[in-house]
Amino acid sequence: MDAIKKKMQMLKLDKENALDRAEQAEADKKAAEDRSKQLEDELVSLQKKLKGTEDELDKYSEALKDAQEKLELAEKKATDAEADVASLNRRIQLVEEELDRAQERLATALQKLEEAEKAADESERGMKVIESRAQKDEEKMEIQEIQLKEAKHIAEDADRKYEEVARKLVIIESDLERAEERAELSEGKCAELEEELKTVTNNLKSLEAQAEKYSQKEDRYEEEIKVLSDKLKEAETRAEFAERSVTKLEKSIDDLEDELYAQKLKYKAISEELDHALNDMTSI
C-alpha cells in the first residue's frame, strides 16, 4: 500500500510538472506569436516607409527632369542671346562704317564750303577792282552762290545723317545693354538650375542609400522572423510532446486508481472473510 501511495504521489508530481511544462510551453508559444505579430507589423511599417521612399524618389526624378528641361531652355535662351549680341555687334560695325563715311563727306563739304567762302571773298574784292567785268563776275558769283547752297545743303544733309546715325547708335547701345542683361540673367538662371540639379542629385543619392539601409533591415527582420518561426515550431513540438506525456500520465494514474480500487475491494473481501471466520470461531 505504501509503495502504491508513493508511486501515486510521484505520478501526481510528474503530472503537475508536465502541466507546468505545458503551461510554460503555451506561454512560450504565445510570446513567440506576439513577437511574430510585432515583427509582421514592423515589416508592414517598413514596407510603407519603403513605398514612401519610392514615391519621394519618383517625385525627385520628376523634379530632376523639370530641372533638366529648364536647363535646356536656359541654354537655348543663352544661345539666342549670344546670337542677338553677335548680330548687334555686326550692326554696330556697319553703323560705325557708315558714320565714318558720313564724317568723310562732312569734311569734304566743309572744305568745299571754306573754298566757296574764299572764292566769294575774292569775288567781292574783284567786283571792287574790276567793275567793267561786273556781268561776268555776277555770273561767276551766281555760280559760286549755287555751289555755296549745294555745299550748305550737303553739310545740312550730312548733319541730319550724322544725327540719325547717332540716334540709331544710341538705340543699338540700349538694345545691346538689354541683350547683355538678358545674357547675364540667363547665366544666373543657369547657375541656379545647376545648383538645383546638384541638390536633387545629392538628395537622390541619399534616398538610394536610405533605400539600401531599409533593404538591409528588411533582410535582417526576415532572418529574425525565420528564427522565431523555427523557435515557434520547436515550442509547438514541445507542447505537443508535453500534452502527449500528460495524456499518458493521466492514463497511468487512471490505471493505478483502478488497480487501487480493485485492491481495496479485494482487501474488503478478505476482511469480510476474516470477520466471518472470526465469527465462526467465536460461535464454536
Curated annotation (Swiss-Prot):
Entry keywords, A to Z: Acetylation, Actin-binding, Cardiomyopathy, Coiled coil, Cytoplasm, Cytoskeleton, Disease variant, Muscle protein, Phosphoprotein
| GO (cellular component) term, any one | cytoskeleton
| Coiled-coil zones | 1-284
Q: Where is this region: Disordered?
A: 1-38, 116-136
What changing K15N does, per the record, is: Impairs interaction with LMOD2 and TMOD1
Q: Name one GO biological process term.
A: negative regulation of vascular associated smooth muscle cell migration
* Recorded consequence of changing E180G: In CMH3; no change in homodimerization; decreased in hom odimer thermal stability; decreased in actin binding; increased calcium-dependent regulation of myosin binding to actin filaments; dominant effect in the homodimer
Tissue distribution of the protein: Detected in primary breast cancer tissues but undetectable in normal breast tissues in Sudanese patients. Isoform 1 is expressed in adult and fetal skeletal muscle and cardiac tissues, with higher expression levels in the cardiac tissues. Isoform 10 is expressed in adult and fetal cardiac tissues, but not in skeletal muscle.
Positions carrying Phosphoserine: S45, S174, S186, S206, S252, S271, S283
What post-translational modification information does the record give? Phosphorylated at Ser-283 by DAPK1 in response to oxidative stress and this phosphorylation enhances stress fiber formation in endothelial cells.
Q: Which residues carry this modification: Phosphotyrosine?
A: Y261
Entry's free-text remark on domains: The molecule is in a coiled coil structure that is formed by 2 polypeptide chains. The sequence exhibits a prominent seven-residues periodicity.
The free-text function statement in the UniProt record for this protein reads: Binds to actin filaments in muscle and non-muscle cells. Plays a central role, in association with the troponin complex, in the calcium dependent regulation of vertebrate striated muscle contraction. Smooth muscle contraction is regulated by interaction with caldesmon. In non-muscle cells is implicated in stabilizing cytoskeleton actin filaments.
Assembly information from the UniProt record: Homodimer. Heterodimer of an alpha (TPM1, TPM3 or TPM4) and a beta (TPM2) chain. Interacts with HRG (via the HRR domain); the interaction contributes to the antiangiogenic properties of the histidine/proline-rich region (HRR) of HRG. Interacts (via N-terminus) with LMOD2 (via N-terminus) and TMOD1 (via N-terminus).
* UniProt family annotation: Belongs to the tropomyosin family.
Protein name as annotated: Tropomyosin alpha-1 chain
Native organism: Homo sapiens (Human)
